[in-house]
Amino acid sequence: MSDTTPEKGSVDSVSPSASNGSNTNNPLNNSSPQPLKSNESDKKPKVTRRSVACKSCHSLKVKCTPSDPNNPSAPCVRCINANRICEIDLNQTRKRRKKSEILEAKRQAGQSLPEHKKEKNTPTQSGYNSSENYSSSINNANDSSLTSRYQSPMTFDPTSPMVFRPQASSAVPPISSNLNPQSAAPTPIPTSGIPPQLPSPHESAILRGNTTSPTSKDDEINQLKQRVRFLETELANKRLLANKKGFSNDSPTDLQSPPFVSKFDLESEISILAESSARLTDLTNQLNEAASRRIQLVSAKKPVDLISKGVITVAEAEERLKLYREQIYGRHPLIAIPDNMHAIEFSQSQPFLFNSIMSACNLITKNADKDVVLAIDNEAMTSVAVEVMVVGTKSVELVKAFSVLCLYYNSPELFKQRRYHMLNTICVSLLHDVGIFARPTYSYNQADGTLKQDASSKDKGNDEYRELVLITYFVTVSTCLVLRRSIYARWTPYVEECCSLLENSSQEKHRRLALFARMNNKLDKIHHIVHAPEMPGQKSGVSQYVIQELQRLLSDLKLKIKDNQYSLLSYYYSIEAYLHEPILTKVFKSDTELDGKAMKSIRYCTSSCLNALDEYSKLTPDQIALLPFPFGSRIMYTAGMLLRLRYLILSLPSHIDKELVPKRAVTSIQCVSKLVEQANILNPHNHYLTKMRLVLQLFIQTYATQVLELLSKNGNTPQNFKPDESETQQLRALAREYNDIRKVSKVSLVSDTRSAEPLDVLSYAATFRRENNDKPSAVAGSLRKSFSENDQAIKTPSQCGQFVSANNTPVPQVINSPPISQTNVPVLHQSQSIINGNNRNSAPLAFNNTTTPSLHQFGDVLPPSSMPQPDYRQFRLPSISNTVHYSSNPRLNANLANPDQLENSYQVLNDEFWSNLLSTDSTDRINFTSNNFNGNTSNDEVFFMNN
């Protein structure tokens, strides 16, 4: 708000200072300048108020009267009387004059100058410019000439009031003109430590020196130009001086730069950058030429495909393409290849995918030369590795090629040379880089040296690309679980979108792929929720509600699997077993009974493992040879888990039902082992089947060795199976009867023609098969009849609903329980031990079961004679104990693996997931661990830490 309007008649009255001509340029006088009158000297001069009141008078809305009538910029009367500083706020609201009034005031001021000359030696002049001059000075604030007129910087803050202090001098000669009036008002004093700022345009007497006014506008313009040149020279000298002293040339304090960014500052920055910069186009062209030359040197006239290199002929390539289309892709439609395309055309258009397809066909190639098969694998690996890692090509064809190599990985290698996880990592990176996720891609235009965004390909939204996304996901999940690493692939919303679209597809292959991806997603969740937090020192265990919810999700997926899809059913049950895998650190505690939760967990896990092996056993050898990598890894895990549970149940000190993990587990694993062996014999170049056989045999040998050691530690009778006092008396009576019969007959007590007579733990566990005795004894047959009658008195499992353990602990009925009571297991050995004080060396005993296939002997699963075994002697690591003696049963010792073979086999495989199932004890002996994690594996997680 403006102050009180001037009194009537103030227009005709002037202050004494007006007689000297200072009223013309007084900005604090709100009245317009008027011509002087002749009779003004006769009238008494009237004190006028200031146009801009001080803060105190403005707040009280009263007239602000200067204490010195000759100096309107002097402190007002009220502030002097109140003994306070008179401050003027230039930003306070005031009533603006109309533009027409401003123009009229300027016109009148221009007319009054010729009539009234200014006094040349006036000690003081008006201290304020008019408001219109103030506006023009603000509009010209970006001009560098206005910011360089002062030797020392002025402090100016538009938002703070101005305090009047003595005036500072200036060494720069001013220019006196109508555009730049001079005054004698006090100026602010610069304060050290405060950055230089623009001086207030309302302060007066800033410029001193020559007050000669120009005679015309042209002269005034020339003077302004000379002044600008002078200031530029002065600024350049200051910059040069600062550079010599070592100061930075962009320091505003040292160079007294203005508080705003001036034109000179921007031009200076651009000139600095331009001096040290080259053209962007030149640099781009230079780098592009070097990159093109590098690629030319790498791929200069070198063939890529196997036909051009002469590894295989065109006829062999056509045969392999037919095998892939009809058998591999026909049973597992994952990576499609063009139909009706000949080998020559395929190898020229997509050489890397062609090489990968040729390598995948090695799984079922029967009559090929071994060196040719290995050369195909090496060339397929070399071609994609050079193209990606050396040349730097990124294409969808390479993604497909890496996917085929990951799905049908068939390289004969030890764990130190394994590469399937590296292939998978490159495949994941390529999938991101090629822009399948609708990410824009760019290409370099060498003609004009620019980068242009490629047009979005319509094919990136088709089903083929969605298949690649899902395939890459579940291969990554399987690979990470095999290597015991955190799964770095995530089920993102885009993956969910791809899976949903394929689930609703009209093609059966798309729906099957989506179903398998869903199953792996549940496997991923189970790993992160149930098993990933299980590390040493952390609290393990998941609530029963979470287990039930995950089981419900799995059951929903099972409804979508057909009954004849044995491979999918086997994979499903392996995931279910992984879900219910018991926390062994809580289950297997010494001198404790299993609680209901542990019993249920073991029962569910065992049932799922058996179902997985049963479904896998329904496959033919040819179907097993065609299974991709994820299926075989889950079967190996399931077999190892089942054998570990079986042994740990046998070795528990608590008296529980040993059929909680039934002996059928051993026969099922042996059946799977024979099936894999048969498939490997039919397909000798399928090295992945050879590795599966090796892993399964490693589990079986470890189990057999530990059971024999368990027998040795407990006098050929495990502590769990030792009878109590009442049973001992019965055994003594049977021993006396046995001695009487032996003295009469002088023949063996028991014939090997019995269908099922488990006389020791290995026979009871069905892990060994003995040869039948061709000359059974009639006396032994009569004694066997008496023993059978005694068995019926004790109750066989077929007559009762419970299995009677050594200490008569009732447990629930278990399917496929042994046909004879367990109390008869240690009868002969224990009774003879009681009588004679030592163990009896009995003849080999047979375990015949007409309902199950003949069991395969341990240690005879060897590669074909045409395939030499690698030398594992350099990898000697902890092996089975050599202190266990098998003198009582030399045939068992012959059927067991050589300790050196066992330790070498363990070294070949000890860096993968089965290391969690096997471990070494304090004596460096391989055994089934009683933990869900291997203590040494926590150091393996360096960058792949659990999330």
Swiss-Prot record:
Q: Where is the sequence biased in composition, kind Polar residues?
A: 143-158, 167-185
Question: What does the record say about the knockout?
Answer: Leads to sensitivity to weak organic acids and decreases cell adherence to silicone substrate.
User: Is this entry keyworded Cell division?
Assistant: no
**Entry GO MF terms:** DNA-binding transcription factor activity; DNA-binding transcription factor activity, RNA polymerase II-specific; transcription cis-regulatory region binding; zinc ion binding
Compositional bias ranges of the Basic and acidic residues kind:
1-10
Q: Which GO terms describe its cellular component?
A: nucleus
Compartment(s) where it occurs, according to its Swiss-Prot or TrEMBL record: Nucleus
Q: Which GO biological process annotations does it have?
A: cell adhesion; cellular response to acetate; positive regulation of cell adhesion involved in single-species biofilm formation; positive regulation of cell-substrate adhesion; regulation of DNA-templated transcription; regulation of transcription by RNA polymerase II; single-species biofilm formation on inanimate substrate
Question: Which keywords has UniProt assigned to this entry?
Answer: Cell adhesion, DNA-binding, Metal-binding, Nucleus, Stress response, Transcription, Transcription regulation, Zinc
Q: Where is the composition biased (Low complexity)?
A: 19-38, 129-142
Q: What induces it?
A: Expression is induced in biofilm.
Q: Where is this region: Disordered?
A: 1-52, 96-222
Q: Kindly indicate whether the keyword Manganese belongs to this entry.
A: no
Top-level taxonomic group: Eukaryota
DNA-binding span(s): 54-86
Q: How does it assemble?
A: Homodimer.
Q: According to its UniProt entry, what is the function of this protein?
A: Transcription factor required for yeast cell adherence to silicone substrate. Plays a role in resistance to weak organic acids such as acetate and sorbate. Binds in vitro to a nitric oxide-responsive element (NORE) but seems not to be involved in response to nitrosative stress.
Q: What is this protein called?
A: Transcriptional regulator WAR1
- Recorded source organism is Candida albicans (strain SC5314 / ATCC MYA-2876) (Yeast)
- Lineage of this protein's species? Eukaryota, Fungi, Dikarya, Ascomycota, Saccharomycotina
Annotated gene? WAR1
